[in-house]
């Protein structure tokens, strides 16, 4: 999957194989999914794998492989695209592992070149509860985030949602600190 040419064959196989064959492929790469995702060629093959997930077993392999590596993947040039593909293709409940990790490492993610963009995509794809989970963390650290070259974009993004409750919460955090 990481070969400059072989990754294209892997992508084609995923498109045309049966669910049972796809189960075998996904299960066989499960332990290596993170390292494959971090590779410039492998990331495309993993994204294609996510595009063609067709059974619950396959989805669970993906979730299990990435669950402890979300921040590492988000902060990587190649890996962040895999997390974004999960956000786009998996349902909100299956993506909860991403939301939990991003919320737990909000400042680290929001102040990173790739992380700030992925965090915005998290907000886009979130359920109502997940959005509240993220915005609560962003709000708590908003004073720190607005002083960062990348974090400030995340706070602006929340304000651009034009949700009065979000705006009020962020405004409250800034009270007494506007002059600093």
Where are these regions (language model features)?
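Eukaryotic gene-expression regulator signature that favors modular helical reader/repeat domains
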Residues: 1-180
């Amino acid at each position: 999957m990481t070969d400059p040419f072989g990754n294209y064959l892997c992508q084609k196989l995923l498109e045309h194989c049966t669910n049972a064959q796809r189960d075998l492929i996904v299960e066989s790469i499960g332990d290596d999914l993170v390292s494959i995702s971090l590779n410039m060629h492998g990331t495309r093959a993993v994204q294609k794998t996510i595009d063609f997930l067709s059974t619950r077993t396959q989805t669970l392999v993906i979730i299990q492989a990435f669950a402890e590596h979300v921040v590492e993947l988000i902060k990587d040039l190649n890996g962040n695209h895999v997390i974004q593909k999960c956000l786009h293709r998996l349902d909100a409940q299956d993506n909860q592992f991403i939301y939990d990790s991003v919320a737990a490492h909000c400042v680290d993610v929001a102040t990173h070149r790739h992380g700030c963009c992925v965090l915005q995509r998290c907000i886009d794809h979130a359920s109502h509860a997940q959005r509240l989970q993220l915005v609560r963390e962003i709000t708590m650290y908003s004073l720190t985030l607005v002083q960062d070259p990348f974090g400030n974009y995340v706070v602006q993004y929340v304000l651009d949602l034009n949700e009065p409750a979000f705006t009020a919460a962020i405004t409250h955090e800034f009270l007494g600190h506007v002059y600093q």
